[in-house]
């Protein structure tokens, strides 16, 4: 093994007030340094803040409380912080209703009255009588326990749902009689990265890992996923292991039953890209049959028709295609195209006996309807340029639902007639926002290596390109995730106050298929940062904004994007928001689900070249003394078990210790919260009020427009 730990932290700690190098004399909380060094391929790497990885330690908890106080004290001086919060609450306070779905004799839908912490699940019977079915706001006093997943059996008489406490990825599953709404079985514990899929009335399949050791729930590595079957009326300890564990070691496993209840399908993966697919014929009681093995391609089951299986895959088709095969011999050499690959990335849903292919052209949606032979039925006319999602349902459905949105259009739900192809508005939100006053345009700019990159720029009409417009530059750039236009009330308030919201579709995402994704992975990862930097330069060169009025923003992998960009080009922007970011690239794979991200990043143990490449951009390892960094708000949560808070703690500590100018470095730590999903409305509003007000304040804005 080429990597080894050189020494453990010694007992003698070096204490220093990290404000010493800050010319603004901001007195940051004291952060101790430890003498800890690791060796990678003969190279010694110091890790003075290793102790911050232990979120259970009393000294870490004390440090967190000091940083929370420091951040809140700084934010409290911003004169319009309360005004921004009021604006957000005002625009947020509108009724939000989801598309309906039918289960048994009821029609279900989610609704949030406006400012409820969590949306409520309602149901309506044939007479139109409506009642609350499940209210997540009653799961906890503070509204921080959320509904993570929900699944009904085929008849709609039984329901199992999972809950997340404090945003944790570790869930519990609760089982109800759908008619009486009473719990009928014990609560299942320690469930993670799991769906819920019923087999008749007997029970359901779910996934989990071994129970975490005491104290390691938030940071311990998760490996060897398992698919279980829980039979109603039995204890969880009696659940049948279907696949996984030591005999079939895979990091991620999901099992689900097809609509016809004939097949159990299992997807297996070791990383976030590439999977194996297995199928078991429950009717004929076969063993698992491999559809594809190895992890070179992505493949998923779209639908079945008797013995025929419909799959979508990027095998021999970087932009995806849909193929058909049979249960008797489903291996790749038997696959036949139903919907061939095109020049645009595609994903496929099924509903009402048809297939609906969503194509993405320059990050904008196009929808086509096909029959089961692959014959084009129609191209569906959308309300405009933007993002459409939905078009899924059971074979018997006559109507399907989809949503449409873009950066200046609140999400509207449409009802689609499968036979006529006509759409009608089902639910249009009554938001205090007039799209007619705003504009969203797509531009293309050139990155450092000559690659053309699309970017959406949204703002209020009448913008003057004088270089003085407050601008948020936001992106992600990883894991084949595409950033398509979507409305946000937070961005609406930003634009209402004179701001520009710009989103470049940089490499690493899925906007142009597998090749676009791969061009931003491993030793091509710097393409992502260069694309982001070029976006900022384009906005400044063309008068939209200037360095003094630009903020960089991103979350999770996007937090890495911001951290790497601000350390590579500290002169690019005035403000930076690395949110819940992956910031220690030498150790990210040591925690929770981090090892599964190696397809995108590589690891420091892979090779000397990979170690050197990661270290060359790892934000934690590239903060340099004597450098003026942007005014920074590092954003994290103390219960984040996806990207552990140690990433943000260590990066924030490095910045506070080495910042060489008056720009402040804040570490905003949300308590009793996770990676982002399931947060209460109050938590989301307050974080965004802090983010927007900090950005404007640091840009020197005195009064809101």
Swiss-Prot record:
Its EC number is 3.4.21.26. It catalyses: Hydrolysis of Pro-|-Xaa >> Ala-|-Xaa in oligopeptides. Residues 1-20 form the signal peptide. GO terms for molecular function: oligopeptidase activity; serine-type endopeptidase activity. Monomer. Keywords: Hydrolase, Periplasm, Protease, Serine protease, Signal. Cleaves peptide bonds on the C-terminal side of prolyl residues within peptides that are up to approximately 30 amino acids long. Has an absolute requirement for an X-Pro bond in the trans configuration immediately preceding the Pro-Y scissible bond. It comes from the Bacteria. The lineage of its organism: Bacteria, Pseudomonadati, Bacteroidota, Flavobacteriia, Flavobacteriales. It is found in: Periplasm. The active site is at 556 (charge relay system), 675 (charge relay system). Its main location: periplasm. This is Prolyl endopeptidase. SUPFAM superfamilies: alpha/beta-Hydrolases, Peptidase/esterase 'gauge' domain. One of its GO terms (cellular component) is periplasmic space. Belongs to the peptidase S9A family. PROSITE patterns: PRO_ENDOPEP_SER. InterPro entries: AB_hydrolase_fold (IPR029058), Pept_S9_AS (IPR002471), Pept_S9A_N (IPR023302), Peptidase_S9_cat (IPR001375), Peptidase_S9A (IPR002470), Prolyl_oligopep/macrocyclase (IPR051167). One of its GO terms (biological process) is proteolysis.
